[in-house]
Amino acid sequence: MTDARQAASRRAVLFGATAIGLCAVWTRTADAEEATLTPDAALAKVQSGEILLIDVRTPDEWARTGLPEGGTALDMRRDDFTQALLALAEGQTDRPIALICASGGRSGHMTRELSRAGFTRIIDVPEGMLGSRAGPGWLERGLPVTQP
């Protein structure tokens, strides 16, 4: 093979590798963007049965503010949290599950932890119940709550 052909072949390989790498980055970015919901979207999806909405806050917090309508209370401090969540998801680690807390910190943390534990469709509601940098939150948006 001539030097010119070898150089052209190397460029083609590098171009292909770069294109594949860019596609992988784009795909991961798209997945990350899909892994959050606004409170309005979470309410719509829980009402339509598309997601299981889990409030990971404490019983004291639930008593003060109520639970998001359609949500299930599951204190993230429970020793059996993962097993209890799996039971609520009827054993389906691929079931879409949205997590909400007060302001997005704990739900974000648990989103990562549950993904590491094998759950494949965990979604964060980063505004939380009280609001955060992500937005005003469930309560400020005037979304419905139920008492625990």
Question: Which stretches of residues belong to each language-model region?
Answer:
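Rhodanese-like catalytic fold shared by cysteine-dependent sulfurtransferases
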Residues: 2-11, 15-48, 59-96, 105-148
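Short, surface-exposed ligand- or partner-binding patches at beta-edge/loop junctions that are enriched
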Residues: 100
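Short hydrophobic beta-strand that contains or immediately precedes a catalytic carboxylate
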Residues: 53-56
